[in-house]
């Protein structure tokens, strides 16, 4: 049994790009789908697809993105911030900038998951899920 499914999702992505794997599979949940959707919209992954296995189990297939000239991953670091044992919250004035704006922070707010830039613009704080750069 997995105690932290978000950390499992981020670890699968990290292991995938460290091993230069093109497509990884992640068990489906709504919050994982929203994290993957944000990564896709920000250009960190090439594509994702939700597939049904055996008519009851859902998987998210994620195609990782690599630099076409150097072959290195677009994602340099993916780091879980708020953990089940230690939650990290911030209001909109204290939302951290990741690498001076080059990376993103995914924040869970009352309006759903969003990036740090959108949360600052909407003046909403929340729980810092992870940093990606």
Curated annotation (Swiss-Prot):
<keyword id="KW-0694">RNA-binding</keyword>
<dbReference type="GO" id="GO:0003735">
    <property type="term" value="F:structural constituent of ribosome"/>
</dbReference>
<dbReference type="GO" id="GO:0019843">
    <property type="term" value="F:rRNA binding"/>
</dbReference>
<keyword id="KW-0699">rRNA-binding</keyword>
<comment type="similarity">
    <text>Belongs to the universal ribosomal protein uS8 family.</text>
</comment>
<dbReference type="GO" id="GO:1990904">
    <property type="term" value="C:ribonucleoprotein complex"/>
</dbReference>
<dbReference type="InterPro" id="IPR035987">
    <property type="entry name" value="Ribosomal_uS8_sf"/>
</dbReference>
<dbReference type="InterPro" id="IPR000630">
    <property type="entry name" value="Ribosomal_uS8"/>
</dbReference>
<dbReference type="Pfam" id="PF00410">
    <property type="entry name" value="Ribosomal_S8"/>
</dbReference>
<comment type="function">
    <text>One of the primary rRNA binding proteins, it binds directly to 16S rRNA central domain where it helps coordinate assembly of the platform of the 30S subunit.</text>
</comment>
<comment type="subunit">
    <text>Part of the 30S ribosomal subunit. Contacts proteins S5 and S12.</text>
</comment>
<keyword id="KW-0687">Ribonucleoprotein</keyword>
<dbReference type="GO" id="GO:0005840">
    <property type="term" value="C:ribosome"/>
</dbReference>
<dbReference type="GO" id="GO:0006412">
    <property type="term" value="P:translation"/>
</dbReference>
<protein>
    <recommendedName>
        <fullName>Small ribosomal subunit protein uS8</fullName>
    </recommendedName>
</protein>
<keyword id="KW-0689">Ribosomal protein</keyword>
<dbReference type="InterPro" id="IPR047863">
    <property type="entry name" value="Ribosomal_uS8_CS"/>
</dbReference>
């Amino acid at each position: 049994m997995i105690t932290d499914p978000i950390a499992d999702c981020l670890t699968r992505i990290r292991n995938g790009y460290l091993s230069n794997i093109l497509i990884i599979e992640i068990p489906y949940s709504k919050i994982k789908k929203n994290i993957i959707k944000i990564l896709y919209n920000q250009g960190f992954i090439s594509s994702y697809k939700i597939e049904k296995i055996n008519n009851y189990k859902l998987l998210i297939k994620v195609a990782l993105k690599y630099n076409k000239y150097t072959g290195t991953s677009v994602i340099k670091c993916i780091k879980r911030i708020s953990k089940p044992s230690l939650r990290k919250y911030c209001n909109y004035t204290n939302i951290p900038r990741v690498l001076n704006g080059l990376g993103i922070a995914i924040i869970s707010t009352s309006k759903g998951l969003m990036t740090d830039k959108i949360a600052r613009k909407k003046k909403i704080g929340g729980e810092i899920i992870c940093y990606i750069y």
